[in-house]
């Protein structure tokens, strides 16, 4: 049995993440999805809570009919203990999937196998692009799985993001 | 759609928990299992990491063929914000299942519906009893689902518990 | 102008505290009341939130027609920086009133003047006694100022304390 | 009885805040003034400690002859629990006064009534403007209540701000 | 080059520690002394600050004419990341010396070599015994190196310990 | 006996620091070197752990044949208690050496003597310059003591810094 670990902030979970997970699911038996910066929400770059992100990812993955672990990971703000932190919050895994240079370096220093997943249509499958479309009224729905759009609608996520991105005159 | 929330420390997950979850699963559509005191491990009362507890519960629930959310919840050490903390880390839920007086009080003050699940064979389906059996070499395996015993064996959990429960002469 | 500093947990604020503050108010121009362990609530020894304790003390002192500073002080869990912590959260003061050995030692080491206030009817003007009376249905109202009893009633404080002091069978 | 909650960083408290509080005091019975980011001081944007800010505001409000609650609120760095955090540190309140988009959003999501107070002479009644005048030797005194200027002088606040705004050649 | 790691709370550093370090110094080239629970002081079980403990140990070891690393280690309160925490605060080391069951278990799980140092006159070379002698006026000086007694006298350590061990009547 | 306190982040320790310490060592009997921001590593501005920085400084100072205290100081993120924090982690000292405006201000407000050490060849004896040379493949070795270069090589510090400074396309 072989488990892979994939981490992201998922603000929100989009088709780029989804295509990577489909790819990874062909290489390992089980996938652990770590939700990074889990403690932050209601900011312009991190609008959604960990619970909301779990609901998004869970909905998208359930459609695939596969078992996944979806685990919120609060920041620990000490890179030197971060790998231990992740390991203590997850079932054992053998391979890490990441393109983030810091994540790659930390797991490599810890002696783990790290693979770089392919990146799909990076110019639109991007949290930054999607959040900007949400604020400006563009078409973000086509960039995320349907189950994700459904969650964002239920929590009034676009309204929240627009409100908190207003200028503060205080 | 109706979700129920059930929280415990699960040190370890045992048949008492399992029977409650089977009961709850007949009352709601989806169950969120919160792993309390997620940040603590390697102590006599809390020997297992959150990741190890996730593996135990996941194994036991997968055998049931049902979807569950299993979410580690680190202590926040401020009861007055604890309900908000839980809500931010979980998908929305409508009913709480707990017999813990503090959990009941906090969710009641927050205006949530709280139900008391039945408790099964409390004299043996008990984390305290099971950990003592582990230390003393008793038969703890019959008190937990098979998938849980398998995880505890893989991580050498009994050996760990015995080691850390030795007297400190320092 | 001369300010005095008086600290307590005030779980709840009672006539013993009140008599001390009346005494202190004859010695200094302004009194700063520090609410210790401000972050804790909903426990058997610390049932009330900082906000609830502020409301209690404020009500009791307003009846006296005097100006007071009432300042919540979260624990910092590092005694060596605690005096700096207190000073950073309060207007400047010249004298400390306390009978707590640790508070006395920390302010003495910091070179501050410390006075021991008289203690009144210690066998009943005591948070421990009052909380026990609340749980057991005894007459706690005569031991606190009227304004305090009013706040405790409004927040259903006795019911909360009784609920959280129930035995946990989980 | 109706209480209003007004929050700011008050670095320093100025006439813009003061005019808002005068306005609010006509709408509610009691005002709770929350001092945000209470734990930070000695920086270019947040030069004053919570205790110093309490002294400033207290002095200004006492001149009005009204009762106010002035409560330091340390950051909790988790927006999703911030409203609970505020509520646990304050007496109960019914209406929030704020123009800060995040504060507005968080209290709105919590189902509270939020009002936008008028803003007065925003181009000069501004902490940023006042701190710049302090550094550059301009006339900041006319922009704050007399009691505030007195506190700033006593703590040598302008000297502190100038010192810490020097370039670091280290 | 081979480094050994030895950890204790050193409240205070006594002849038992000293004899162990002399023993260890014959087995490795360099010794790293970790001061555990570095953030705590002014309590009955942990009266001395990390800085005071560094001064004690430094004085005792300098008399030996050997190079040592003396490193304060604040508690991190998460056993699962503790080894990473220690490693990030220390130069690389190859062998751990400890009789503490938890320390032994954590380093063993991390795959490190752990040795049990001999324990000398455990009935008197004991922090608990020495602190009790300090409180009761017994002869503690013969149980610590001279340099340690000198530091304790300079900081008035015995007076502090007696003061904070008084009963709290508050 | 007179001790001086010198603080820096030492990312990495370089000849500028070394020349200052040589200068200070002529003015005081013992030097305490505080390693600031000790908890941070593996970032572009703070690549090295506290333990790695201790090894660097220790190696450089041992060549001088002098006794030094080298003490990691985690950030406390509350300037108003920072001086107390430093004092609790260090042996007593009488004079502070710093050119950092905030450090100077905080120790001055605490009534300590502060001296400004001379700065040597600031245009190259600079952590920023040295880290940029490391990334770009320039000659950084001549700017640090030999013992420091040796440690950086052993931990593959340049490779780490280059890896984590790559652009994140995630």
Curated annotation (Swiss-Prot), chains A, B, C, D, E, F:
Membrane spanning residue stretches: none
Primary location: cytoplasm
An annotated Gene Ontology molecular function: ATP binding
Entries under SUPFAM superfamilies matching the protein: Nucleotidylyl transferase
Enzyme class, spelled out: transferase
Catalyzed chemical reaction(s): beta-nicotinamide D-ribonucleotide + ATP + H(+) = diphosphate + NAD(+)
GO cellular component terms given for this protein: cytoplasm
This protein's pathway: Cofactor biosynthesis; NAD(+) biosynthesis; NAD(+) from nicotinamide D-ribonucleotide: step 1/1
Keywords: ATP-binding, Cytoplasm, NAD, Nucleotide-binding, Nucleotidyltransferase, Pyridine nucleotide biosynthesis, Transferase
HAMAP family assigned to the protein according to its UniProt record, in alphabetical order: NMN_adenylyltr
Family membership noted in the UniProt record: Belongs to the archaeal NMN adenylyltransferase family.
Protein's recorded name: Nicotinamide-nucleotide adenylyltransferase
Organism: Methanothrix thermoacetophila (strain DSM 6194 / JCM 14653 / NBRC 101360 / PT) (Methanosaeta thermophila)
């Amino acid at each position: 049995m072989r488990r892979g670990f994939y981490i992201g902030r998922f603000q929100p979970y989009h088709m780029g993440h989804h295509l990577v997970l489909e790819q990874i699911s062909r290489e390992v038996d089980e996938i652990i999805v770590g939700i990074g910066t889990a403690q932050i929400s209601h900011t312009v770059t991190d609008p959604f809570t960990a619970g909301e992100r779990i609901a998004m990812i869970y909905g998208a993955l359930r459609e695939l009919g596969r078992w996944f672990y979806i685990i919120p990971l609060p920041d620990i703000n000490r890179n030197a203990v971060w790998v231990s932190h992740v390991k203590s919050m997850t079932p054992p895994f053998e391979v890490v999937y990441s393109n983030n240079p810091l994540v790659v370096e930390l797991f490599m220093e810890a002696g783990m196998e790290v693979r770089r997943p392919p990146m799909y249509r990076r110019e639109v499958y991007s949290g930054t692009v999607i959040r900007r479309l949400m604020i400006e009224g563009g078409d973000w729905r086509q960039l995320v799985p349907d189950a994700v759009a459904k969650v964002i609608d239920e929590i009034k996520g676009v309204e929240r993001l627009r409100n908190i991105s207003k200028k503060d005159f205080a």
